[in-house]
């Protein structure tokens, strides 16, 4: 499964570890990419769970994208990932302002977010 993490701070790291645990239990092989805003080195135990670290998106399409960067960056991350992921996990709160629920896409929120672009 091709997975992208946007933001790999403490929250992203927690989700990364949990995903690896669940995938291992189910025999799912992961190919994890971390989209980073900083070139600083990750802790070795975290880096070992990541196959690729990138500073900008390319044309790769992912099965799943985790958006775990700061809330103020969620909307732009979603816009940048339009057409690049089949499913999204977005750390709450999804947006800092409901204005983001307007425009060229519609989001329905509950326990799951479904975005129609």
Language-model features, listed with the residues they occupy:
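Structural motif
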Residues: 2, 63-64, 87
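Short amphipathic alpha-helix with an adjacent loop that forms part of the alpha/beta core around
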Residues: 52-61, 103
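Rossmann-fold NAD(P) dinucleotide-binding segment
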Residues: 72-91
């Amino acid at each position: 499964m091709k997975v992208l993490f946007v933001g790999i701070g403490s929250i992203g790291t927690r989700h990364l570890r949990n995903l690896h645990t669940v995938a291992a239990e189910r025999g799912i092989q992961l190919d994890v990419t971390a989209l980073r805003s900083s070139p600083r080195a990750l802790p070795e135990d975290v880096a070992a769970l990541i196959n690729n670290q990138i500073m900008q998106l390319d044309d790769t399409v992912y099965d799943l994208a985790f958006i775990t960067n700061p809330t103020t960056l969620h909307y732009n991350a979603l816009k940048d990932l339009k057409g690049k992921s089949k499913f999204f996990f977005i750390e709450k709160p999804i947006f800092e302002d409901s204005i983001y629920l307007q425009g060229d896409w519609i989001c329905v929120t509950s326990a799951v977010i479904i975005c129609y672009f």
